[in-house]
Amino acid sequence: MRRRRAEVRKIAPDPVYSDILVAKLVNRIMWDGKKAVAQKIVYRSFEYIQEKSGKDPLEVFQKAIENVRPVLEVRPRRVGGATYQVPVEVQEPRKTSLALRWIVAAARAKKGKPMYVRLAEEILASYQGTGTAMKKKEDVHKMAEANRAFAHLRW
């Protein structure tokens, strides 16, 4: 049986950009509790975005997140011994969480450049509607579309 619902923790906005989304990105980048290192990576990547695009990095980042956020995903559902991939709508907080996760994962997967450059390039690519994170979103949507026949199994 399920226990009670997990409480949603309040997250403090980022000290430099006063934005909760940036704070979430910093937390996603952070490894082993090294927040200062994560902040340095994020801020340097924002400077890089400013340099390359000439636009406000915060706006670019927010638009990139908006572009990567998925609408649908598939969830496994067991029905009489068979497991079906059932397409379901993604809830609001999870949309943002997945978008951040995919952007960071895509940046980490690239090699040969400093992390701040990889992150900035992935954010810029997502802003333009290209890149690995956008590919991931499209794959998830394709999977949901392919399993549309099982939509009636939603719970």
From Swiss-Prot:
For molecular function, the Gene Ontology terms on record are: rRNA binding; structural constituent of ribosome; tRNA binding
Q: What Pfam families does its record include?
A: Ribosomal_S7
* Keywords on record: Ribonucleoprotein, Ribosomal protein, RNA-binding, rRNA-binding, tRNA-binding
Q: Which GO terms describe its biological process?
A: translation
Q: Which cellular component terms (GO) are annotated to the entry?
A: small ribosomal subunit
Cystine pairs annotated here are: none
Q: Does the keyword Ribonucleoprotein apply?
A: yes
Assembly notes? Part of the 30S ribosomal subunit. Contacts proteins S9 and S11.
Q: Which family does it belong to?
A: Belongs to the universal ribosomal protein uS7 family.
Q: Spell out the protein name for this chain.
A: Small ribosomal subunit protein uS7
What organism, scientifically named, is this protein from?
Pseudothermotoga lettingae (strain ATCC BAA-301 / DSM 14385 / NBRC 107922 / TMO)
